[in-house]
């Protein structure tokens, strides 16, 4: 996500606490109710995780309901838990829960996700434009001047996301080919010549939304 919004009063109280702790801030360029993590989007998650014993980069491949608890299994035994929250793309959720909740798995499998190619750009100097966000322009679904977000520093960096249709049509491209094809699309969308690149890379999110 490029940003998050706050509408529920309980969430608003939490975001106010994050703001006081310096891990969230408003991002006016995206609108009056847009917020981002600072210095990165994962800062609020890191702040919450600091209060708990969290296992990162742990692959869970199976769930078992046993004696009123949940047994998680991956490369080894991941432990027993009172509850499981599944926050995965529908395709992956269906595979994970099928043995314990086939009806839920069927519903998840019927909701395919759309892919997204994302390109990360850094330039040697600022792009001569006052635009910080580009929406729905040709193959570009969303482009953000990442340096316009609070806490990001002064570097001229952009994150460019292709539309779902373009991403699906070019799903199996190599990352460098996807980046190379989207760069001129971004230049056309921004409406001005781009300065020299310092960095260009791409990542494919197969299950983006």
What is each model feature region?
Residues 1, 10-35, 57, 105, ...:
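A short alpha-helix-loop-beta-strand transition element characteristic
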Residues 4, 48, 85-87, 121, ...:
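Generic structural signal for small/hydrophobic residues in well-ordered secondary structure
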Residues 56-71:
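A conserved short coil-to-beta-strand element within the FAD-binding core of flavoproteins
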Residues 187-209:
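Flavin (FAD/FMN) cofactor-binding core of flavoprotein oxidoreductases
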Residues 3-7, 24-49, 169-181:
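Short beta-strand to alpha-helix junction loop
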Residues 26, 62, 200:
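Catalytic phosphate/metal-binding cores of nucleic-acid and nucleotide-processing enzymes, i.e., regions
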